[in-house]
């Protein structure tokens, strides 16, 4: 600014003076009273006129308490220096309030990725790592924990801003098929919290209703479920003491589903062969790193590779009695077993659940537990002598028809270990909220609610009956050898095996529970309930987070061809060795 000297009549003039405001040096305009004969240094006349005009319009105001102590007083609408805000998570310079907390761009992006991709992390320390700017990437588990503790909300992660490729794959909805149940253990409260869903109004990004014929997902992605969970144990479940790899069997199921999809898409897709590591990378969508547990995953995929490479020739050596039946012969000699339908080792059904339960239990934990139960049920069925005398095609048909019934019996047997009641209660709460917010149609909610009620009623009844391991084994055998499913070959042989199982169960009840005369009939009367449960809804509740719209019965042939030794080895390795979550 040009400076001039003035010796005119007294006027109001201004000058620039540096003062301290909030520990910062700021240049301010100071009003100076002049008098005749006094020479002062002032700003140019044009600037002074503009300042006087602003003052007259009451836009600026100055006070002078002496030349050395002048201070500026601005109106509320005026811009004033702002203190620098720090990220509540790592202490870096904050860029604003994101998802409910003052945070930097780094923590904002980290939280968004973690919620959108449903990533789970593990802490290599004591879950109390210090999170600062320079080491915030060292422990993602503690960083995510601190994000939540500082007030970041997962339901604020907007679905409509998700990557374009994700939106293209799931038109009209954010969820591929089912809500990502993301369970959080509230470490601040010593009490068990009621399982509740945080509604996904922000996540939905539109109406969740879909036309009939499309399998509509039940929930939105990234929804948090507040649950204080304590480790549970059950006689029917074996729980490991170390953090197991939650990706192994779930990844196998996903890989089978993806492989089946590629086969259906055409030769150009199905002819491409992926190694186990490449397959895992495809499952992870190229952006989820597997930290540790590589040996466990490789062993599981080795078993998968053997199953996929098994040719029809390997099945020719099976003791099959179906070929003659399919050849048109109406008189087929039935096979008689020299031993009972079940032996002592068939009574054992030990499900190894992922343990310990992490503080942040995402959908992979639930799907992994369900995958293990599915594998265990199928390989248990394969071990039955009566099952082994049938052909491979009959194996596939039988299991495809009744996999949901076998799975439900397994859920009832391992309900405590899987915390089934907690999961179902949370889903019911969310369905009620979705109905109130018009996110799901009333018919859709009614169908799922009825399914859950039937499932819970079945589990509760078996619990009240105190069904033991042997009784569960015989009930599964009776369900497996059901001759009334359409499309089965050699129905007479299957019916014969079912009659043997019923007879052996009757003898067991008479010997073990002689005073409970109605126990045998009560057990058999529970089986019709299994036919009322929808396999499609069962897939959606427990598997859709893994395989989307692929049906379980499409991957059953691959699972049945897996070698039992490989499956058992993968299970043992996962139980004995610590692993990590996909994240």
UniProtKB/Swiss-Prot annotation:
Boundaries of every NR LBD domain copy: 248-563
Molecular function (Gene Ontology), one example: zinc ion binding
InterPro entries: NHR-like_dom_sf, NR2C1/2-like_DBD, NR2C1/2-like_LBD, Nucl_hrmn_rcpt_lig-bd, Nuclear_hormone_rcpt_NR2, Nuclear_hrmn_rcpt, Znf_hrmn_rcpt, Znf_NHR/GATA
Zinc finger (NR C4-type): 87-107, 123-142
Cellular component terms per the entry's GO annotation: apical part of cell; cytoplasm; nuclear lamina; nucleus; perinuclear region of cytoplasm
Entry superkingdom: Eukaryota
KW S-adenosyl-L-methionine (keyword) present: no
GO biological process, one term: regulation of transcription by RNA polymerase II
Pfam family, one: Hormone_recep
Keywords, sorted A to Z: Cytoplasm, DNA-binding, Metal-binding, Nucleus, Receptor, Transcription, Transcription regulation, Zinc, Zinc-finger
Tissue: Expressed uniformly in the early embryo. In contrast, larval expression is localized to the epaulettes and mouth epithelium. Expressed in multiple adult organs including lantern muscle, tubefeet, intestine, coelomocytes and gonads. In the adult ovaries and testes, expression is specifically localized to the smooth muscle epithelial layer of cells which surround the ovarioles and acini, respectively (at protein level).
DNA-binding region boundaries: 84-159
Subcellular location: Cytoplasm; Nucleus
Family per record: Belongs to the nuclear hormone receptor family. NR2 subfamily.
Stated role: Orphan nuclear receptor. Binds to the hormone response element in the upstream promoter region of the CYIIIB gene in vitro. Both isoform 1 and isoform 2 bind DNA.
Self-association and partners: Binds DNA as a monomer.
Name assigned to this protein: Orphan steroid hormone receptor 2
Organism, as annotated: Strongylocentrotus purpuratus
Gene that this polypeptide is encoded by: SHR2
């Amino acid at each position: 600014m040009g400076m001039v000297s003035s010796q005119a009549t007294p006027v109001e003039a201004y000058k620039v003076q540096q003062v301290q405001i909030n520990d910062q040096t700021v240049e301010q305009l100071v009003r100076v009273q002049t008098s005749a004969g006094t020479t002062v240094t002032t700003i140019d006349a044009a600037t002074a006129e503009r300042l006087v005009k602003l003052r007259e319009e009451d836009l600026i105001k100055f006070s002078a308490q002496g030349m050395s102590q002048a201070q500026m007083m601005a109106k509320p609408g005026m811009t004033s220096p702002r203190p620098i805000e720090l990220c509540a998570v790592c202490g870096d310079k904050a860029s604003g309030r994101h998802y409910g907390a003052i945070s930097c761009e780094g923590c904002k992006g980290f939280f968004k990725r973690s919620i959108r991709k449903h990533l789970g992390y593990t802490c290599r320390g004591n879950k109390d790592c210090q999170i600062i700017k320079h080491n915030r990437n060292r422990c993602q588990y503690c960083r995510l924990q601190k994000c939540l503790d500082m007030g970041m909300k997962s339901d604020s992660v907007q679905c409509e801003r998700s990557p374009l490729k994700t939106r293209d794959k799931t038109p009209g909805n954010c969820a591929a098929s089912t809500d990502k149940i993301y369970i959080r253990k509230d470490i601040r409260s010593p009490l068990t919290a009621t399982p509740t869903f945080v509604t996904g109004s922000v996540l939905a990004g539109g109406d969740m209703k879909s036309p009939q014929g499309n399998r509509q997902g039940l929930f939105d992605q990234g929804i948090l479920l507040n649950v204080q969970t304590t480790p549970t144990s059950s006689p029917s479940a074996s729980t490991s003491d170390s953090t197991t790899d939650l990706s192994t069997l779930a990844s196998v199921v996903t890989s089978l589903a993806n492989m089946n999809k590629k086969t259906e898409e055409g030769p150009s897709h199905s002819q491409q062969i992926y190694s186990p590591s490449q397959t895992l990378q495809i499952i992870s969508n190229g952006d989820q790193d597997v930290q540790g547990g590589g040996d466990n995953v490789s062993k599981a995929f080795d078993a998968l590779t053997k199953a996929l490479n098994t040719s029809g020739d390997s099945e020719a050596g099976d003791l099959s009695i179906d070929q003659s039946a399919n050849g048109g012969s109406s008189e087929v000699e039935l096979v008689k077993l020299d031993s009972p339908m079940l032996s002592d080792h068939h009574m054992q059904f030990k499900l190894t659940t992922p343990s310990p339960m992490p503080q942040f239990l995402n959908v992979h934990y639930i799907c992994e537990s369900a995958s293990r139960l599915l594998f265990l049920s199928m390989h248990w069925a394969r071990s039955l002598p009566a099952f082994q005398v049938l052909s491979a095609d009959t194996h596939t048909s039988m299991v495809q028809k009744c996999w949901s019934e076998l799975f439900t019996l397994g859920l009832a047997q391992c309900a405590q270990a899987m915390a089934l009641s907690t999961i179902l209660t949370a889903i019911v709460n969310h369905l009620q909220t979705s109905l109130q917010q018009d996110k799901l149609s009333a018919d859709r909610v009614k169908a799922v609610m009825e399914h859950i009620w039937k499932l819970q009623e079945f589990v509760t009844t078996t619990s009240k009956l105190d069904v033991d391991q042997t009784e569960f084994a015989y009930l599964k055998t009776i369900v497996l050898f059901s001759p009334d499913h359409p499309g089965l070959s050699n129905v007479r042989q299957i019916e014969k095996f079912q009659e043997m199982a019923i007879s052996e169960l009757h003898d067991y009840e008479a010997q073990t529970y002689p005073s409970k005369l109605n126990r045998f009939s009560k057990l058999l009367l529970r089986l019709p309930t299994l036919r009322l449960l929808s396999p499609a809804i069962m897939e959606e509740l427990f598997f859709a987070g893994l395989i989307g719209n692929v049906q379980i019965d499409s991957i059953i042939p691959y699972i049945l061809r897996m070698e039992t030794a490989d499956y058992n080895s993968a299970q043992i390795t996962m139980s004995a060795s610590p692993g990590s979550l996909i994240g």
